[in-house]
Amino acid sequence: MKQITIASRESKLALWQTNFIKNRIQSELNIPCEISTMKTQGDIILDQPLNKIGGKALFMKELEVAMLSNKADIAVHSLKDVPYQLPQGFCLAGFMPREDPRDAFVSNKYNSIDDLPKGAVVGTSSLRRKAQLLHYRDDLEIRDLRGNIQTRLSKLDNGDYDAIILASAGLIRLELVERITQFIPVEISLPAVGQGIVVIEALERDNDLLEKIQKLNCRESSRVATAERAFNQELKGGCHVAIGAYAELDNNQITLMAMVASSDGKKILKRKMIGDDPTKLGKLLAQEMIALGAYKILES
């Protein structure tokens, strides 16, 4: 191949991720790359929660259009922003090693969630984070918070919030780890499906490119992500419901932990299951939780 064009969003984190992939392709596959940046609807519409304006696909559509029109060969995403069902003709071609998957508690005044006073204002637009936070501390006030990492941090620094919740991985990648006041234990806030994993999206028809990209694939990330996404797909979960899933690999055994909650955090169901087939494991755990009333909880 002469050159690979990578479609990317314009935020600092998106460009960090895209440059990470670009450097790996150039050094390990010896193929030159260029980056083509673009704004997505998810970047433009910031005054409404994602679940009200179309969900995670809003961060991807423009990049996928660029690939379909031959303006880009691949796109790079945070896996947690990728819906469980891709548009026809697209696939996830490479999973990168996972960064810390935990949620991060960020505050200028308080050291942890436990330190927050009653009625403290916490910023997050994630229903998953909101539900788990309210389940743990029902005396907090959760307010929506959209925008890139820098925008969210500046709103915290301006005093709009007592604390905000972000993904640890993004802060670590942007060398902002010192802003993390507490890595929230997964027992309190189970991560989003795929959180901490960067993925490459490509067209299924591009066999030559897929074969090359596969050489960059991290087997462990691929296996745990497949389990988490299979669980999410079986539940048909998007950003309009409070769902979390996190898998760990030990030898060939996958331990999958999952959570569904009502949006107010009053009802929560957590389960875990161990297996060696990621797709089967994700589906079985989802079916077990459906039998225990997962849909009723998500609807409430």
UniProtKB/Swiss-Prot annotation:
GO cellular component: cytoplasm
Record-linked Gene3D superfamilies: Periplasmic binding protein-like II, Porphobilinogen deaminase, C-terminal domain
SUPFAM superfamilies assigned: Periplasmic binding protein-like II (SSF53850), Porphobilinogen deaminase (hydroxymethylbilane synthase), C-terminal domain (SSF54782)
EC number: 2.5.1.61
Any Gene Ontology biological process: protoporphyrinogen IX biosynthetic process
Cofactor note: Binds 1 dipyrromethane group covalently.
Cofactor(s), by name: dipyrromethane
Associated pathway: Porphyrin-containing compound metabolism; protoporphyrin-IX biosynthesis; coproporphyrinogen-III from 5-aminolevulinate: step 2/4
Catalysed reactions listed for this entry: 4 porphobilinogen + H2O = hydroxymethylbilane + 4 NH4(+)
Entry's transmembrane regions: none
Keywords of this entry: Porphyrin biosynthesis, Transferase
S-(dipyrrolylmethanemethyl)cysteine sites (modified residues): C239
Other facts noted in the record for this chain: The porphobilinogen subunits are added to the dipyrromethane group.
Family to which this protein belongs: Belongs to the HMBS family.
Function: Tetrapolymerization of the monopyrrole PBG into the hydroxymethylbilane pre-uroporphyrinogen in several discrete steps.
Protein name, UniProt field: Porphobilinogen deaminase
